[in-house]
Amino acid sequence: MLRALSRLLSTTTASVHLPIVPEKVVDHAYTTKNYKWMPGFSFPAPRSLEQVVKLALLEREPPARIREIWNEHHAPRLDSVATVWGGEEVAALAERRRRCPRFVYPVLKGDGKFFNLIAEWQDKFCIFSYLDDYRKDPSRAEPYLSVALYDDLLARTGLVLVRGDFSGHLTKRDAAHVLNLMRHFYFVEPKWVETFNKEPAAFDFSAFVAAVPRPPEKTDAAAGKVLF
């Protein structure tokens, strides 16, 4: 693993920080007023779904309406992205993340420039940190993005609500694309995740970057629905 990280750090990258100025967030009847903007944070994602929504109200709704409410709540927010996954997807992810808890994600900034995030799963949360900082000291690396899986409604609806909270180092479009890259490489094209964790010496970073799906010009970043 360390050899794979060392090779990544020797790759030419460019880091572009684009802070975002928060706008007023529209209230929703089923959501809490727990709005916060964090240019830097120790743990960005709410630990429980009840910190985000009024769960007692939301759980009464049918699955289709739950999707709508979840996406409507996050659409105007400039500190988080969200999507909804099915239970089968999350079950497959649970097994793979246990065997392959870490992976690297290039954040593409155009003109061939990018910087790398290293992601590490901790139970139902995935923390994304700047790779250079992580390599120096993982315990002190600042999180740029944290993805949380909320499975409170899984048994009744078959849905898992997914939310990614990000710092001012990322734009909303960046965060939405990284969230979808995570889904792509853990569900659709897992060979890169498997190689990175199990055979790090064989991980070809240049080939990997060439294989990374590029974000479309127009992204439904509010709901985190970039489809490859």
Residue ranges and their predicted role:
Residues I127-H184, V193-K198:
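Charged, surface-exposed interaction regions in soluble eukaryotic proteins
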Residues L2-G110:
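Charge-rich, low-complexity N-terminal segments
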Residues D79-D152, L161:
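The feature represents the first ordered module of a protein
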Residues K24, K33-K36, K54, K109, ...:
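Context-gated lysine
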Residues T171-F228:
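Alpha-helical oligomerization segments
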